[in-house]
Amino acid sequence: MATLKDIAIEAGVSLATVSRVLNDDPTLNVKEETKHRILEIAEKLEYKTSSARKLQTGAVNQHHILAIYSYQQELEINDPYYLAIRHGIETQCEKLGIELTNCYEHSGLPDIKNVTGILIVGKPTPALRAAASALTDNICFIDFHEPGSGYDAVDIDLARISKEIIDFYINQGVNRIGFIGGEDEPGKADIREVAFAEYGRLKQVVREEDIWRGGFSSSSGYELAKQMLAREDYPKALFVASDSIAIGVLRAIHERGLNIPQDISLISVNDIPTARFTFPPLSTVRIHSEMMGSQGVNLVYEKARDGRALPLLVFVPSKLKLRGTTR
């Protein structure tokens, strides 16, 4: 069975582009030649959407999952990390024969009364929690967890990753490390920054003035890095919270005329496809974000099937991939 990923690889485009072309997204700005190539490949591989497969087979799904994304849909275009999570959800639902409804919180929830379970991707608002719990108690958070919530969760051990990056730099003889990151809530540090600051101070390699926080975008990374580099004294080793931010940081460093990694080095998180093609290629922590989506589906499905009462927290594996932005 062909998948969106198969089409994206053969067409040489991103998953986001394939998804938007096949869904006839009117806001997509792409060459007609590219659209035709994607459609031809989809036809050649006999790709069918999940709804088309259901019509063709006449199958009736016993399970129905509602996936709610607590962010703007545009974020999937700017950060492939989130698109990969959604792709993992969609692929696993197709594999298990589960009916799936996707929706974005800001667009409102669909009028669905009977669901097997709900996946919430990203940190939920209190209103979203209340709406979801009114539909079912089989809820799984993805890319977020909260001890004591009573719900399943699939997440990344970001605190461990932050410590791993600090230890890597310390083993290289670095005695001052900076941080450039984003925030999920205005004025509030995310777990990467919190763990970085706490562990870095313990190891005496972090200063308060070397912590920079903005948004999770390349433009934010660019602006923050420019501000940092404008100072006479700045850290020569950086932990950047995501690859998307790091792309902007790289641009600011290049514009400053600095050599990477001789003058300044950096490590980011996610290992998006673009990370291998930056200049120099990004050293980054690979996150199996597609697995986060598929494992979320598995937890909801397994709880519905077996009646498990205790909530589970699953951390997906990660691996530091050293490339050209570190010594």
From Swiss-Prot:
PANTHER family: HTH-TYPE TRANSCRIPTIONAL REGULATOR EBGR, LACI-RELATED TRANSCRIPTIONAL REPRESSOR. It comes from Escherichia coli (strain K12). InterPro entries: HTH_LacI, LacI/GalR-like_sensor, Lambda_DNA-bd_dom_sf, Peripla_BP_I. PROSITE patterns: HTH_LACI_1 (PS00356), HTH_LACI_2 (PS50932). The lineage of its organism: Bacteria, Pseudomonadati, Pseudomonadota, Gammaproteobacteria, Enterobacterales. Residues 1-57 form the HTH lacI-type domain. Changing residue 196 to C: Broaden the specificity of inducer recognition. SMART domains: HTH_LACI. GO terms for biological process: negative regulation of DNA-templated transcription; regulation of DNA-templated transcription. This is HTH-type transcriptional regulator EbgR. It comes from the Bacteria. Residues 4-23 bind DNA. GO terms for molecular function: DNA-binding transcription factor activity; transcription cis-regulatory region binding. Repressor for beta galactosidase alpha and beta subunits (ebgA and ebgC). Binds lactose as an inducer.
